[in-house]
Each structure stands twice: as C-alpha cells, then as structure tokens.
Amino acid sequence: MNQILKYIIIGILTLNSVFLIGQKDVIESIEKDIERRKPKLNHSKSPSNNSYEDIVKDMDEIPGLFKMYWDKDKDKVYLEIQQNQLDKVFFCDVTRSSGDAFMFDSGAMLQSFPFIFKKVGSRIQFIHQNVYFRAEPDAAISKAIDNSFSHSIIGSASIEGDPHPKNGALLIDAKDIFIQDIPKVGIISGYFKRKYNLDKRNSYFNEITSFTNNTEIDVSLHFKNNKPKSAYTLPDPSSMVHKYHFSLSNIPESDFEPRMADDRVGHFLTMYQDYSSLMEDSPYVRYVNRWHLEKAEPRFEMSKPKKPIVYWIENTVPVEYRDAVREGILLWNNAFEKIGLQGAIIVKQMPDDAEWDPGDVRYNVIRWIIRPGAGYAVGPSKANPYTGELYAADIRVSSDYVRFFHRKYTEFIETIDAKNMDSDVAFDNWWKNKLPQDENNDGNSCEYATEKMNEMDFAWNYISGTENLGDIDLQQFVHDGLVDLIVHEVGHTLGLRHNFKASSIFTPEQLKSKEFTEKHGVTGSVMDYNPVNLSADKNSNGKYFQTQLGYYDYWAIEYAYGFPNKGESEEDYLETVASKVSDPYLQFGTDEDARSSSRGIDPTCSRHDMSTDPIAYYNDRIILANELWDSILDKFEKEGEQYPKMRRVFGLGVSEYARSIANTAKFVGGIYHRRDHVGDPNGRIPFEIVSADKQREAVQFLSKNILSQDAFNFSPDLLNKLAPERLGDFKGTTWRISRIDFPIRGMVQYLQSKTLYSLYAPVRMHRMLDNELKINSRKDKYTLSEMFESLRSEVWQEIDKRQNINSYRRELQRVHLKMLIHMAIKSNNQFPRDAISLARADLEYLQKRISRLTKLQSLDSYTKAHMAENLSKIDAALNAQLPKEF
C-alpha cells in the first residue's frame, strides 16, 4: 500500500465526517476499505504451548460484542478482538460506581470517547480517536488533517499466544486496558495535594457481562498514598478503593439528523472544525446536544414519540422523596407537549431486586449519593461525538441537600476569620487581576444544589425564626425545593445550559404576588440559580420555589426538539424560533456571561439574583438578613437549642451580604449585553451602557450597607453567644478552628474589603474609561473620577467630621489606603494610567486632611495612632521613587 493511499484510509477512519454524509455510510466505507486491503491470514499453525485454546481452557466464556474469558479464582480476564474489530470505531463510556465520599463521589459520569483497537507488532493499542478536526473523506485536505493532528493512546496490551486457528481472533490481557488510571485519580488528587497512585496488584474485576451491541465491565481500583493526609471518610487515608464501570459499545445506527446550534439560545454543544471548504467564515460546526425524539405518527399535530426518554429513579432514593423526584422529571413533558410530543419522558422506579447496573449507559438514572457535608447535585449527559445525539444521562443528588436544616458547622465562619481574610492573598488577587477559582470552570459545571441548599437554610431559618411570613410545612418546603432542583438538573440532561438572565424578567411587585407567581412562576427559567423567593414585605409573598417551567424553557425545547412545518426547511424553522430573542420574557445569558468578578459586565446576568431591579432585590435581602439576626436571641436561645446553631444562623446572614456585594458591583461600569442578530424583529444592539443613575445607585447601596459608619452594629450580648460546636467530628474541626470566639472584625473586614476589591478591580476601571467614550457627550456619564471621589468621601468621612474612628472603620481605611498606595506607586501596568493619577490625587488630599486632624486633642488614642500611621504611609508613598516603567 503506498503512503498516500495509507493516509487516505487513515483519514477516512479517523474523521468519520457527518457533515455531508451519514455516519453509517462512513463507518461502512471504513470497514470495507480496511477489509479489502488486509493481508490474507493463514490461521492453520502447528500446535504450540501458547495456543488460543490452551490459554482460555477452563475459563468462563462470556460471548457478546467483545468475547471475554474470565477465571475468577485467578483474577484473570482475557478480551478477544476479532480481525474485523481491529481499526473499527467503538464507543467507551466510563462511570465511577462508587467513590470515597471525600474527593470523589459515586455515580459520576466520566469520559465518553470513540476508540479503536489497533495492532502494532505484537501489541494492541487502545486509542482515543481525535474527532475534533474533520473533512469530507474524499477531500484532498483530509490528508493534511491526518498529518496535522494526533490521536491519544489510552493503553496497550501484548497479544497473548497464537491467534484463533479458525478466525484469527486475538487475545489480550484485559487488565492492561481496564486496570489503569483512566479516570485520572492520580492527577486530580494531586490538585488537592493528596496524590494517590493506582495499585494494580490490589485492583481487580468485579463483574463482566456482554451483549450483541455492548460489553459491560466493572472493576475495583485500589489507590494508595505513601504520605497520607487526613481524609475523614476513609478508615485509613493511605488507601481507598473505587469502583468503575466501563461500557464498550457499537456506534449506534440511527437516522438522527444533527441540528445546528445558535448563540441566541443556550444548549450544550458537540463541535468540531470542518476543513472541507476554506470559503466558510469559520471552520467550526456546532451541533445542539439533544435526544432523538420523533413523532410516532407525524401526520398528527400531537403524537407520542417513537422512542421516549426513560428515566429510572434508583432504589437508593429515599421513598419519601421519590414523588418529588418524579414530579421534577415529568415537568418537562409540558414543554414537549407544546411542540406536539405527548409523553416524551417516562419515569420508572428501579426495583430493589433489579439485576442491571445503574452505571450501564443504557439506563438514565437519578441516583442518591452520600458525600458528607456536600449538598449538591449534577446532571451530566453523554452525546455522540459525531452528531450530538444524546444517549445516556445520570443525575446524582447528595443526601445532604435535604439535611440543610440539621447542619451544624463552623466552616463558614472559619473562612471569614481575620486570620484568613487579612492575609495578602485577597490583596494579591485584586491587583494581579486574578480570576476567582470558580471562574476557571467550563460551562458543564453546576453548583445549583449547593447554593440552593444554602438558600433553603437561610429561608427556613428566616421563616421559622421571624414568623414574618406565617406558618409553613417543613415537608412541603423540602418537597418543593427538591422539585426545583430536579427539574433544573433534568434540563441539563436534555441539553440545556444555564440561563442566568431568566430571573430578571419579573418586577419586585409581581414576585410578591401569590396569584402571579402561581401562574407564571418566580423566574423565566428553571435553568437559572434561583434563590428562594422571600419578600421583606410582611403582608405579601409569592411562592417560594420554581416548581414549573418558565417561558425560556419552552423556547429552548422548541429550538432543540421542535419540528419544521410542512414545506418549511430546517434552517428557516430554526431561524424563526431563534429570532424571538428580543422577547423580554426570553432573556438569555449563561455561565461565561454571569461571572461575579469584575469580568462579568451585565448586571442582569447573575447567579442568586431576582427581579427586574436586582439592587432593590438585594436591599430586601439585607433587610431580611438583619431581621434574621435580630430574631436570634429571641427565637433560637431557648431550652433545647444550642449556641452553635445561633452561630450558624448568624453566618447565613453574612452570606446574603456577600452575595449582594458581588452582584450589585456589576452595575458599576456595567454593560447590558444582548445576543440579537442583525435583522431580528425588534432587534437590539449588542451593548448598552448601564445608566449613570443606576451606577450611582449601586455605589450608594454598597456605601450605605457595607462601607458606612452605621453599616454594622451588633449587640455584645449576641456576639458573646455565637459559640462553635465543641463536640468532635471526623474532620477534627474542634482542633482546626483558629478562633473559638466569633471573629466579628474579620467578618466585617471581609465584606468591606470584598467591596473595595470589586469596585477598584483593574478590568472594571479600564471598562469605565472606555464607557465614557461610548456614551453620547450630551448624556450623563458615571466616570471613574466620580467613583474615586465617592469612595474616598465614604471611607474617610470622619476626617471631615473630625470624629473618632471605630474599629471597623479603621480596618476599612487601612485596606483603602493600601490599595491607593499600590495603585499609585506599584501598579505593575495592571491599572489604567488615569486610575494611577486619581489614586495619587486621593493620597495628596488625604495627606492634607489627616495632617490637620492629628493636631486635635479631643480624639481618642486609637484614632490618633491610626491617623499618625496613615500619614506616615502616605508621606512615604508620595516621596517614593517611581518604578522604572514610569
């Protein structure tokens, strides 16, 4: 075979293009080409000690897609590869069936990839195929694709003995393929500074089954750590055993047609670069991830599907919560009925004596897991990497999600201790303009359950503690909260991404109305991170949870699963649906738009906000937090209660303050971002600067509630009762906690520093200066200089009033001064030059005012010492030699 022909064949094998030709045709052409060019093998060999028959003698034979031979007593497994299975593309799906509940949870869907078995000399390679770069198989450029991009070898095994004497089948030791760290536990645990290495000697096969189209393999993998650290879920942290499920399957034959994605609606994508034509604007081809749902009777407007999506409720789900899980799943049928599919989703209960494994990719399972202290849920799904067709989904719900009202912990307070927040880490992250850790995640991550658990904790304690909103049944509260969570996670398994703009479509007054929210819900989408809907108005409150689909959810399903009208092309249908983008009820923005740091530009695209007026919403949350704090001594200091609960409830209010800072600050230098396309009905331009008045309102909100002299004033009686838990736990919390008393100054400094770091963020200040050039000169502008002046006046108001400065304010002023000095003389090119000038001007202003104040004899000793220290720092900064870059 000449070299060029070889490249063509490998290119065809690799690419499996589905852009212009069907997946089935590509696979068949690959098999024919390979078969035609294979050398004819002579399998009749003289007997040897390594004969196929001798190797598998007395072993259990497991026929199926891949024939397996298993000797359980010797823990020996052979995998047979037929000659026509070499170089053929299959799917491999990996699931973690059980974990350690510390770093790795059970039921986690892991890798899903196309692979081939390739014979290289006397070895068989297990190769992950690269499907990200493609071209039509007969295009000349397909040769360049093969030359330019690599596949990945996952593992390899020696061929055992002779080929089968009749069909030439080969045997390999399955341990070399499946008893290895494919889940990358070693790499991931290394991130936590707890690196575990696979111990192959003590890893083994648990169960093997094989069928016509799939082979299912369960293994137990032992990982060890020679320098273990405490891991409270393990009896010995030097050793942990995980179980993994491998599913090997044929690429399913299907008449599924990929659907092109559109940025106006949010779906998970299967994408690749197609180099068949160099005349396209972009090589990217992006498909919506969706299930193959077709009408059984397409001539009718309403029809049952040919093959519905079936979800199984695992038998681990507590009986008392199964109805809520079922309700959350079936809510999506409302959206499918609107596009003409009746009963698109079916829910079944996994029996206690089920013989199938929930890790089997043929079953979509809602699973209950235990990971102490982690109230979370995730809803991953798996898509055909060639077409975007979804074929498997699992949802994992942590048991602690519904244990929120029993939690007793000190972790939250520990994280805001002055020992932690007064370090240089937060300051360095500010001036280096580092992304928060959570913003390095991709769009597949979901933390809704964790946040919802905290929201439910706050809401329940507020309702039960203040009694402002009347009585409520705890069981119904938990039921509705679980429905809210499940419908969100099922949405992910249907292909929908987060929509963090959906909560901005209803007015504050509408959200207070029970009648309105019962009809319309509390948000535009279940795919937002929706807080519990609480009102500071004691006379009216809407429903608490989103237990119905929102307007956006119907739209997203219509785009992904709807059917073109008779005579209408797919392209025209999709454009008609997507062009509804300007509808105020269909607002969309997703993970990369909703950053809570200064890189998030749109204040209406945030997590944990609500209403058309987020600032008003957060003003309500501040009121609620203070009412909760005021109720602590009255409602929680009673016989039978414990002081640690008071400490925990107090921390819930702090959490509300922290959220309000991150999202309210987004208005300052903010830009409303829209996804409309040119020509859309009522189309809007992509960017609109937030009005100057709204930016001022945001700064005033933060000044009043976080930075002002009156922002924090707590009763000593309350502070002296905020005790931590003193009984031991598996984590050793009683030993690790750095402050037994409540670190009130550290808490306040955390909130105030967070505010300043956000407002003075380099990216925000660059954007504010740019925004001044994007607004008509006749319009009111909120400028960077105005923000500097406003913050300086708020933080240092005592020097104008000639007042003593309290402890909270002294800490605030130290942080502010440190930031100004750094901007003025150590900017390191991160800050705009105008910001550097303004910082220096602020230092000169403060130098003059503080000089006068130090002469006053009426000031207390703290204030005098504080002012003298500040003046010394300012003098040194203004007289400092500037760095070379100046």
What are the language-model segments listed below?
Residues D25-V317, A335, I339, M350-D473, ...:
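Auxiliary tRNA-acceptor-end handling modules of aminoacyl-tRNA synthetases
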Residues V94-R96, G328-I329, R362, Y409-F412, ...:
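Short secondary-structure boundary/capping segments
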Residues L330-L341, R371, G491-H492, L496, ...:
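Sec-exported extracytoplasmic/periplasmic mature domains
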Residues L86, E320-A344:
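Zn2+-dependent metallopeptidase catalytic core
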Residues M1-D25:
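Bacterial Sec-dependent N-terminal signal peptides
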Residues G465, I472-F477, A502-F886:
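Conserved catalytic/binding loops enriched for acidic/polar residues
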Residues L41, Q349-I369, D480-A536:
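The catalytic-center signature of Zn2+-dependent metalloproteases
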Residues D323-L330, N334, Q476, D480, ...:
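Solvent-exposed, polar/charged alpha-helical surfaces in well-ordered, non-transmembrane soluble domains
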